[in-house]
Amino acid sequence: MLYKSGEKRKGLLMSGCLYRIYGVGFSLGFFIALQIICGVCLAWLFFSCFICSNWYFVLFLWDFDLGFVIRSVHICFTSLLYLLLYIHIFKSITLIILFDTHILVWFIGFILFVFIIIIAFIGYVLPCTMMSYWGLTVFSNIIATVPILGIWLCYWIWGSEFINDFTLLKLHVLHVLLPFILLIILILHLFCLHYFMSSDAFCDRFAFYCERLSFCMWFYLRDMFLAFSILLCMMYVIFINWYFVFHEESWVIVDTLKTSDKILPEWFFLYLFGFLKAIPDKFMGLFLMVILLFSLFLFILNCILWFVYCRSSLLWLTYSLILFYSIWMSGFLALYVVLAYPIWMELQYWVLLLFLLIVCRLD
């Protein structure tokens, strides 16, 4: 059925030619649900013991049916979730630049992104290996540099004057509780998306008559096809090469009397870890890391406000896309490349300074 572009629409009506990349959001929700299910199975048998928490995962592989599958899914899907999440964010940024997207949908999505970062970091710490122990020690000491509340937050996280069993127990409770709060925020994100409608290609902007279809089973099947195709590709990683996402140092048993040679974060934390590593001052590194996260939201807010006044300006659309993909994205990827290869570590200060100047200029 055809509707005029300014006509009031009844129910949830979508464009008949949505791109495949729109299905990434559905895949994210699908894999988040699988992560929560596998996480609940792991949480039932978790030992909040400072010494035995790493051996628990080995025991889970040996003594429980399909234990290796549950553990591999929970580990490998974390990297997959972040890969899909970054694709979803960059797709949303492109659509916000090109089309009018409501700010509330983006704001709730930004809160989801922050929650996922917190949940993933707590999950990284819970096995309590040499790497995660010293990673938590360094990060909590950085939090202690925050004025007024820093010392109190550090002691609250530790539960004592040092990291012990109570720390793992507290982090385990947070790691179980926060995903359910994440589900509530995710439902709000979907509600706002359905209420304000999605930015669907060129129909809302350039076409006077655009074909609108009811959100029927066809859209579900197409999204499910993408999700199950990704799941099929992940079967190889889960059953054969699941240690591909692991560092060798992640298997080293924790020893509080020995300092780890290096701290290697997961690849999806690499750009955040770069700020803490490149800035000598702890508080300034933490401050710039927070500014980086909020600069993404401020950049989109800037684009939306400009869009209100430059709605019909093709020059502004071209300028925004070139600005984002050639400068913002190049700085983001440069941080990854420089921090991933130690041979280029001497360049990290210059790349970090250039990226911060660009972000401040865009905002």
From Swiss-Prot:
GO biological processes: mitochondrial electron transport, ubiquinol to cytochrome c
Topology versus the membrane: Multi-pass membrane protein
Entry's Gene Ontology cellular component terms: mitochondrial inner membrane
Pfam families linked: Cytochrom_B_C, Cytochrome_B
Keyword Nuclease part of the UniProt annotation: no
Positions annotated to bind heme b b562: H74, H175
Job of this protein: Component of the ubiquinol-cytochrome c reductase complex (complex III or cytochrome b-c1 complex) that is part of the mitochondrial respiratory chain. The b-c1 complex mediates electron transfer from ubiquinol to cytochrome c. Contributes to the generation of a proton gradient across the mitochondrial membrane that is then used for ATP synthesis.
Protein name (record): Cytochrome b
Organism: Trypanosoma brucei brucei
Lineage summary: Eukaryota, Discoba, Euglenozoa, Kinetoplastea, Metakinetoplastina
